[in-house]
């Protein structure tokens, strides 16, 4: 029986150690207090070039997840205004994606993702740790 437990532990450790989501994205800041009317800049760094499509998603206070942007090439930019916030996404380099959030009226959490393909069939999405923004 103890051999089975050791085998299970080894399999669990191997799956954690080889989990690609651990090192695919670095997102910051992790949280920020934002005075009403002030803009905040978020940054996402891609750690693995096999997943070149980078996106931003927002999650509102009701935990609803909503896609915002997907950008592939350096210097790509997109702007979007939604109830509660205005967004400007910029693909700075092959490995860096930025998001400026302005005119926030309520808090939200923003997630950077990466995937191997773009379009409607993105395949597996890998999420960053999230940036929780709280409006003062």
UniProtKB/Swiss-Prot annotation:
One of its GO terms (molecular function) is peptide antigen binding. It comes from the Eukaryota. One of its GO terms (biological process) is adaptive immune response. Residues 117-120 are annotated as: D segment. Residues 1-20 form the signal peptide. One of its GO terms (cellular component) is T cell receptor complex. Keywords: Adaptive immunity, Disulfide bond, Immunity, Immunoglobulin domain, Receptor, Signal, T cell receptor. Gene3D superfamilies: Immunoglobulins (2.60.40.10). Pfam families: V-set. InterPro entries: Ig-like_dom (IPR007110), Ig-like_dom_sf (IPR036179), Ig-like_fold (IPR013783), Ig_sub (IPR003599), Ig_V-set (IPR013106), TCR_variable_domain (IPR051006). Residues 21-116 are annotated as: V segment. Residues 121-136 are annotated as: J segment. Disulfide bonds join 44-112. The keyword Secreted does not apply. PANTHER family: T CELL RECEPTOR ALPHA VARIABLE 1-2, T-CELL RECEPTOR BETA CHAIN V REGION E1. This sequence was derived from a T-helper clone. This is T-cell receptor beta chain V region E1. It comes from Mus musculus.
């Amino acid at each position: 029986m103890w051999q089975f437990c050791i085998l299970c532990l080894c399999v669990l450790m191997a799956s954690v150690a080889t989990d690609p989501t651990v090192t695919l994205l670095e997102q910051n800041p992790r949280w920020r207090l934002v005075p009403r009317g002030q803009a905040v800049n978020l940054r996402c760094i891609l750690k693995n070039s096999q997943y070149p499509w980078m996106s931003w998603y927002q999650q509102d206070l009701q935990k609803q997840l909503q896609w915002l942007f997907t950008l592939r090439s350096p210097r790509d930019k997109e702007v979007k205004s939604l109830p509660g916030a205005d967004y400007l996404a910029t693909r700075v380099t092959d490995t860096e994606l930025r998001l400026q959030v302005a005119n926030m009226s309520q808090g939200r959490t923003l997630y950077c993702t990466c995937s191997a393909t773009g379009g409607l069939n993105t395949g597996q999405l890998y999420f960053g740790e999230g940036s929780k923004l709280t409006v003062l």
